A protein has these predicted regions:
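Short amphipathic alpha-helical segments and their helix-coil junctions
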Residues: 14-19, 62-77, 122-123
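Regulatory N- and C-terminal appendages and interdomain linkers associated
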Residues: 94-136
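Conserved NTP-binding catalytic cores of kinases and kinase-like/nucleotidyltransferase enzymes
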Residues: 6-16, 74-79, 113, 127, ...
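Active-site activation/catalytic loop segments of kinase-like enzymes and analogous catalytic loops
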Residues: 30-74, 88-106
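Active-site acidic catalytic loop and adjacent metal/ATP-binding pocket
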Residues: 3-37
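Pocket-edge positions in alpha/beta enzyme catalytic cores
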Residues: 25-28, 55-58, 112-115
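All-alpha amphipathic helical-bundle segments outside canonical DNA-binding/catalytic cores
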Residues: 76-88
Length: 136
């Protein structure tokens, strides 16, 4: 590994992966699956928090289908997946709130954070819905 890159040991100079350690965590893999669902909008919904809409295109599985595939391949028990999704929304809301605060303090010169503050409340509501209603 060189800095944030994993290099292919069989092919010198070939980058196999680029790592972003800033948001990395150790622990339950369902934490990552929960966060993936924050970034995985489905066709016909507007959550107001997604950063991409590519998963709304034909051919992409729904979050439920993705969870079923994950469980079938890993054997993971997804009975508490809604908790991980809720946690991910709250974490995302906190991260966005931090970005907004730094922007307002002038610590993000040159970065356009227009619209970020409007994402916080929907994230909190989606987190609540995941925890209380089991919404994925």
């Amino acid at each position: 590994m060189y800095k944030r890159q994993l290099l292919d040991p069989r092919t010198p100079g070939r980058v196999r992966a680029v790592l972003d350690w800033e948001m990395s965590t150790l622990g339950d893999p369902l934490t990552d699956l929960g966060l993936l669902f924050v970034y995985w909008p489905q066709a016909g919904e507007d959550r107001g928090v997604s950063v991409s809409s590519v998963t709304t295109l034909p051919g992409f599985p729904t979050r439920r289908e993705l969870a079923e595939r994950y469980a079938s391949r890993t054997g993971a028990d997804l009975a508490a997946l809604h908790w991980y999704v809720g946690f991910a929304y709250f974490k995302f809301a906190a991260i966005v709130a931090g970005i907004v605060a730094r922007s307002r303090a002038g610590a993000m010169a040159g970065k356009d954070t227009t619209g970020y503050a409007e994402k916080i409340d929907p994230c909190v509501e989606l987190g609540r819905a995941a925890l209380e209603d089991g919404v994925l």
